[in-house]
């Protein structure tokens, strides 16, 4: 046998030599020189003969039938080893190859990574195409750079690769990796450059099929150069991944804040209900306390009186006074009896207060539990980049209603009868959309269908909705539930029985799922002796509904463990209910089963249902818990919740004897009053002063009471206790039931032993305790109950820890245990060296995590400093993250040396000031949520700050320049404060997220403070007063901040943006003006200038603030009416040029009964269609003469270039005091609708379409002094006779052709200035002389002044023409004359034949046989008397006059 093996060994070595070009015979000599051997495909079944090659550095064995690694013991120099495509089942035999750098073991049958610990020089390891399930055994391979595990069965990465920090290339393709969270473990590999999870040569991992896979990987591994064989080194790719991830983080941060806000709202409602319910007990307690203190005062006075009488009464009179003493003794006993009864009633009502508080806490706990899953759900969505999605259902969702019906159908009343449960009500249903689990389920389900007989109609019925059974001893914890929802049921069940580890336990009955839990809770609370309010917790439950494929199923066999080994051929096993609980009272038990499903992937979690049981109320108490909510109204007490006999008993106690008569209340205190109360004249003898039950607010004149030891000032009106500082001997002070808001000034009371400050308004825990600690060093008893303290949860420990002399606090004895706890508590309220070591991290970079947690919290959880870190030099400067949340700090100290601190969190402490951070100049993120800070200060040097969160503080405002130096601030969260203004944020241009919900922002002006923040994309202002003050608040904000992507936790839709533009586009509001001015003091404003701003409406509210505005310029906007301007009371000048004014008031919609032609005329009056009807309609419908006047102070109105067609619709008649009206550049064709403007002095209608004036244009006498009609279409000048005061008339650039039209101007005797240039008639120069002659008062014509020479020349011209025209007329008269008057013969009708040129006299032709009568000629007065009124010259004849005039003028010049 040995010889055979040696023979085979020799043949193998021969084959080895042959394949590598070596001679077998001399291999002993050649072997030492050989450094590389290769064997491919066959001929080398075992690794033998390598001892001949001592210097071998590379060995390659491929496709051999080798089953084990051996024979390498002598290969000490081996650096590269290939044993691929063989049959290796185990990694072994490599311990001696310590110089190995490259190891290739791919395409084998290896199932475990092992025996590599000593290969510390290994750089390349290929184990692809094996059967490896876990990544392990690589801890010591510190130099590993290339790892290939593709084509294996790896399902999880875990933390196994953390030690391999030098890893640069990693291939995990073709495995079973499913989780994004698992991939984040690779972030520790900072040198990783090449990652493959989806190599084309292998099957992809399931995680690669998820949405946003590449984005997730590139964000978490920014140093990657290649991903899945693709080059991803481009900067743009990395920036896109980072941008997408940051958007996701911001979005989910917003969603989480919304969830927290909703929870706070619910808690606030509960607190309001609690306060309402506590109102009656508190009132009763105050009433009884007042009566008690009154009786105690009477009793003390009675004792003093009795003592005084016994001391001063002579012996002879003592028997006489025995009756008096007896009566006083009886009275004292009655007082004591009544005091005892009053104490009992106070105890009773205090008990009611405690009951209310207990139920309130239970309700708060339940609310928090209900909302407790929502935030983890959102974080899971973020971490999985939306591949696990949770959706809360409503009644509009079919699946929500289906779940409700399923719960009700699986509920049997008989099962819950023993627990007093009568029904179940679904409170919430959350749908789970897990993409990876669904893909697994569908894949397995399809495989089952392929293997089974799919023709079986019952096979599909094996899909069932069942309830998952949690361990009753382990309540449904968030972590466990989240693991199931994220990873499925595999390895998530922590139950104790072994069968539950192998199979998933499910039931189809609510009772089978819930009854074990209820019984366990009842037993637990019974053992712990909890009150009934605690046992109410079982009323609320959570059910996980899963979709289950039962497949081949059989009933479980008795007394046989349920596991896969006992049931190898089935998918599931079921146990009927009657086998579990045999005593039943209804038949539904026979339909109830418990199922055990072996394949975890065939159980898909789909719905989480939160429900509440309705119960029979068995215990009558202050609250009715049948509805599981605190009752809303205090009046419920009178309805049986507080029995009427209790209230009657109160009255009976108060009416008990003795009934003390009320004393008159003191309003002020003086020496006389003090003396009368103390019943002594010596101040130093006054040791007790009772001022209970008065109306005092000051304690004057107490300085002389140096011996005062006891002072009672309860039930007064004090807001501070400054006046007691000089009472150095005071030992007892009762200041309860006042309005004390601060103890500032409360000092020097070193002998004070008893202090009662209950029922006041003290809030600032730290400050008030400091005062007491400093100035009441002997205090033994302290009562501070019923004050609105800021941090009530830690108040007792804080007081006990600081006031070490106390023996009683709030009526309770302070135990030693409490003292020790308080001292421990106080010791932790200061930042010490140990504190810094325990809560800090030295990581220099924030880990790339998809999380909304503060960076300080993330870093300190991942990597905390060790307790011995301080032994290293300069350890303070190495701290980069500090998380001191919930440490009960009262101040920030000892951070001066943390010069490199980047991320800090101080949430949920007792901080009242921002101090101690000035030296942390590298701070990038600061969180101060849940403190008592009232002012942001001390951050001006923190120029690198990018995130600041100060939610749930007492901020009342933001200082103006607080954020000016924060040039990198991206996120600011100031929720739940008392901020009223955002003006300090005007220069925070880098701000991206702003959360300022639940503050006191009330006016629109604050939104304008944010308009300059162009980077702001998320804004949350929910719960501010502005939401209710501003109608359409959401659209208002969207319009003014167009860059926003989300508002108040809701994404902004495109339709909302459009609606916002429609609602608020072009609105001139008070807020816009205030934004431009920088203030809202409009009373001093006199001018409003807002041009070219696309304004459509004006809405200035309140109008009274604009009462001094006199000039308004809204030129070049989009106004269609005067809008809100009509309400401005004192506007004198209004400029609305270049708008679209249709009417003073908004124009009504066109009436449907108008014809199409009439509608056309309304739009284009020049069309002529429907003119008559429409004009009449307008007059009837508008009736502006009868409308009341508006804007009575308006004097100047500019409406140029508005496209105005119809002046009647404009309703200008309502502007009764208008003096100057400018209508140039419109489309006006008729001057009308101005009759009531009786004081109008100037009218400008230049550049319109006026052809003529109708009868109503100037029908009434007018005060018009100036009329501009240039650039119209005038051909005639009729109907101007009412313009009796007109002084200036501008008619340039019209179409006046006939001089007869100019004649009509003589009806305006007051005319002093006239322009007619640009008219056709101006081509004939005679018009100037005609106008000068006809208008004797005219002073300027066409811009040229008229002097006396002009008038002389005009008269000379027409006198010279008189004779010539007379001869012409005589020569053309007929031979037969008519009878004429003696002084003048009446001219015959005739017409002159025109001359060839108007400036050339020419020769006249004969008169036509049928002359036409000519009327309305305009001639000089001297010439007209010869021709008569009906004679008119043609334009041709005018040429003769013109030529004669020019010749005469030329002659005159020559003579001169």
From Swiss-Prot:
It comes from Mus musculus (Mouse). It comes from the Eukaryota. It holds the Pfam family LRR_9. One of its GO terms (cellular component) is cytoplasm. InterPro entries: Leu-rich_rpt, Leu-rich_rpt_4, Leu-rich_rpt_typical-subtyp, LRR_dom_sf, SDS22/Internalin_LRR, U2A'_phosphoprotein32A_C. Residues 305-325 are annotated as: Disordered. The keyword Nucleotidyltransferase does not apply. LRR repeats lie at residues 53-78, 97-119, 120-141, 142-164, 166-188, 190-212, 224-248, 264-287, 339-362, 661-683, 684-705, 706-727, 729-748, 749-772, 776-802, 806-833, 876-898, 899-920, 921-942, 943-965, 967-991, 993-1010, 1013-1037, 1082-1105, 1106-1128, 1129-1151, 1191-1214, 1215-1237, 1238-1260, 1262-1283, 1284-1307, 1309-1335. This is Leucine-rich repeat-containing protein 9. The gene is Lrrc9. The keyword Repeat applies. The modification Phosphotyrosine is found at residue 525. Keywords: Leucine-rich repeat, Phosphoprotein, Repeat.
